[in-house]
Amino acid sequence: IIGDTINGAITTADNIAGKIGII
């Protein structure tokens, strides 16, 4: 499902950014 893939990628990127301290 394209929508799930895009949402998953955004969530993963947000989690990584949060761990680094960007967000």
Curated annotation (Swiss-Prot):
Keywords: Phosphoprotein, Secreted. Expressed in skin glands. Transmembrane segments: none annotated. GO terms for cellular component: extracellular region. It is found in: Secreted. Belongs to the Frog skin active peptide (FSAP) family. Septenin subfamily. May act as an antimicrobial peptide. This is Septenin 2. It comes from Osteopilus septentrionalis.
